[in-house]
């Protein structure tokens, strides 16, 4: 809002305009005027005042029509409108407010009431503009946070011996709580994982950053996936348990040359093992989510990924994606897509399929996929 505020007075009676000018100028407001509805609408669009005093009964275009035009124009900023009229019946007041008026004054104007209404509307205008500025600053900060979070996503390495890896994470908002990482180990194996923090937005993103750092730090000392989760769980519990947060995770150690794969799970979905005949069956690895309780133990399972097979890690944003009819994408639909599609790989195509299925529905959760496959 300007300092001093700019007020537009629209009235077809020169005497009324002069009186309003004198009373408002005495309170150190800048005043501009218009003598009918059409010119008032044009001046409001051009000058975008901080407040409009608008007469209702005017030739060519009455005040209610001017009000509707201004309130329905999305390109204009918020400009509070005080409707000024001799009509004082309740139906007239209702009609004015329904047209978009923010306040109502009846003629003849009481000076004290006029000044009080003007100050009240300008306070609302000031608060509105302040909130708008804060919202713009927050959006800029969130965009910066999005860029920073994208730095956590690792480069996708080129593997040897016919092995390949691909990953994608799409936050539901500017930043999210999903996480994946690909960590090369000295023995030429890879440590990869997909994790999901039990929240969304900025808190989840901050926990995600802490979890990423703790896993990378622990991996320098411990590469057995079960014991690594035990270590990370203990340190994460000290960090987030009081706030009620936790994280689910599936972590895999993969040897590209042989296809050997070891994995452990903390409260997460089992990996999807895609074999020639469909979905492979293997015993589940048990383990609770990270951060809930210290001293937990995690199971380690092992499979051999043969040529033509794939392992798919995913978060709940995949199977819980909703379409415009509030239907969940679901596990069965995901498996059906894989069985009816050519692969490997399947991850990229599955992501596109979910996008088409969702349509114009707003994403309600972060979505992350990581796939390892062999030619």
Labelled PLM ranges:
Residues 132-311, 359-375:
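… and, occasionally, acidic/histidine-rich disordered N-termini of signaling adaptors
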Residues 250, 301-313, 318-375:
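C-terminal catalytic subdomain
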């Amino acid at each position: 809002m300007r300092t001093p505020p700019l007020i537009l007075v629209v009235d077809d009676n020169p005497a009324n305009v002069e009186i309003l000018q004198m009373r408002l100028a005495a309170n150190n407001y800048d005043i501009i005027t218009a003598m009918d509805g059409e010119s008032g609408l044009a001046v409001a669009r051009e000058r975008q005042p901080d407040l409009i005093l608008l007469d209702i009964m005017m030739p060519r275009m009455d005040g209610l029509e001017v009000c509707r035009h201004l309130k329905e124009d999305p390109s204009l900023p918020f400009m509070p409108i005080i409707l000024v009229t001799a009509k004082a019946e309740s139906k007239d007041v209702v009609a004015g407010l329904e047209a978009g008026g923010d306040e109502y004054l009846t003629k003849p104007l009481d000076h004290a009431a006029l000044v009080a209404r003007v100050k009240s509307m300008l306070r609302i205008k000031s608060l509105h503009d302040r909130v708008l500025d804060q919202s713009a600053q927050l959006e800029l900060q969130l965009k910066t946070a999005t860029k920073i979070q994208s730095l956590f996503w690792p480069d996708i390495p080129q593997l040897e011996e016919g092995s390949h890896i691909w990953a994608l994470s799409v936050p539901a908002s500017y930043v999210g709580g999903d996480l994946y990482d690909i960590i090369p180990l000295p023995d030429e194996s890879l440590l990869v994982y997909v994790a999901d923090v039990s929240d969304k937005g900025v808190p989840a993103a901050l926990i995600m950053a802490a979890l990423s750092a703790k896993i990378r730090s622990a991996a320098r000392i411990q590469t057995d996936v079960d014991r690594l989760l035990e270590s990370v769980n203990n340190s994460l519990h000290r960090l987030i348990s009081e706030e009620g947060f936790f994280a689910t995770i599936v972590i895999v150690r993969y040897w590209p040359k042989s296809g050997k794969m070891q994995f452990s799970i903390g409260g997460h979905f089992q990996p999807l093992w895609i074999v020639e005949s469909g979905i492979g069956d293997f015993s589940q690895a048990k383990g609770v989510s990270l951060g809930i309780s210290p001293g937990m133990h995690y199971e380690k399972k092992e499979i051999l990924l043969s040529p033509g097979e794939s392992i798919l890690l995913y978060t709940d944003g995949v199977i819980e994606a909703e379409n415009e009819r509030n239907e969940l994408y679901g596990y069965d639909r995901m498996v059906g897509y894989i069985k009816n599609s050519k692969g490997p790989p399947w991850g990229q195509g599955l992501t596109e399929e979910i996008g088409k299925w969702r349509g114009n529905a707003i994403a309600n959760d972060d979505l992350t996929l990581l796939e390892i496959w062999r030619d």
